[in-house]
Amino acid sequence: MEISFQEGDAVWTEMRERGKNELYYMAGVICKYGDVVGMTEGMHKIMCKVVEKKTGVPELDTCPQRLVLMPRGSGKSTIISQAYVVQRIVQDPNIAILICNEKLENAQSFLAAIKHTFEQNELFRALYPEVIHPDIKAANVKWNDTEINVPRTTGRKEFT
């Protein structure tokens, strides 16, 4: 997607807000996973609403835990373990998130994909400059295979 907005204009503001508030949009458009996992409204939009607790069904939206079961290759991990984490960081840069998996390599792969979004995704970087370090190689910035830290407004000791 060619960037055709200026920071602060109506298009920029709308895209930022949609990404912050709609996981389906964050995953499919901003993180660019739509074509990668073949996102569809019928399956993936519903999954995103369940994850975000925005189904409109009080019993689902107020439940403290959610279990999402989908077939292998359907994009569940890409959307939930990557795009949802990116969205939560954008919503609250002071958050601390633990990414775990049965295999360490999978958790590291999820973090690598998240880092790629922050480092290489020009659309994401243009929409959310406040969570991008100007110099991720700086000595005081944690940015490696096991932990990252985005700019924060608090002195929280845990990494992002």
Protein language model features and the residues they cover:
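Contiguous, well-ordered alpha-helical segments that form the cores/surfaces of helical PPI scaffolds
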Residues: 45-52, 78-90
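Glycine-rich phosphate-binding loop of nucleotide-binding enzymes
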Residues: 84-101, 105, 112
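Conserved aromatic-histidine-acidic binding/catalytic patches
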Residues: 35, 72-73, 98-102
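Short, well-ordered loop/turn elements at secondary-structure boundaries
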Residues: 62-63, 93-94, 155-156
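Walker A/P-loop
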Residues: 60-83
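Conserved nucleotide-state-sensing and coupling region of NTP-binding domains
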Residues: 100-160
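N-terminal accessory segments
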Residues: 1-64
